């Protein structure tokens, strides 16, 4: 069994960002167990689709770094009232995307190839606007990388193919998304 763990990556990202305050409990403030399981499944989807372990690790590592950085900015009240409106718009759009992803999974023959990529691109643009003044161009590149990677229509078509090899991962991802929604975290 492979030793990849999104929690370990989250801890590495947190250590780099928060250097003196890095601890496993601090990572858990940003990435809970359910989110970690979803990230692990996203990694498996990416790895199976791209056949590239290092690229798949990099995209998840970038996702974790961005999530932790935004969490740090939010916890330290770095966002202006206008940016908080953008954050709420992003959260709403992300929630909409999760609900759409779940619906496509639960209701046969409803998957539409262009819908999720469009939602993900809207999320990406909102997030880039939110962090424009707070994060470096390198972090902006990470955001681009993550959203562009998971908005790949061909990957999504394979993911939503009930007879495909990625389908079991989709089941776990949607189960996790449902749990986050039920808990009010997404």
From Swiss-Prot:
Keywords: Immunity, Innate immunity. It comes from the Eukaryota. One of its GO terms (biological process) is innate immune response. The keyword Manganese does not apply. The keyword Oxidoreductase does not apply. InterPro entries: TNFAIP8-like, TNFAIP8_sf. Gene3D superfamilies: Tumor necrosis factor alpha-induced protein 8-like. Acts as a negative regulator of innate and adaptive immunity by maintaining immune homeostasis. Negative regulator of Toll-like receptor and T-cell receptor function. Prevents hyperresponsiveness of the immune system and maintains immune homeostasis. Inhibits jun/ap1 and NF-kappa-B activation. Promotes Fas-induced apoptosis. Belongs to the TNFAIP8 family. TNFAIP8L2 subfamily. The central region was initially thought to constitute a DED (death effector) domain. However, 3D-structure data reveal a previously uncharacterized fold that is different from the predicted fold of a DED (death effector) domain. It consists of a large, hydrophobic central cavity that is poised for cofactor binding. This is Tumor necrosis factor alpha-induced protein 8-like protein 2. The gene is tnfaip8l2.
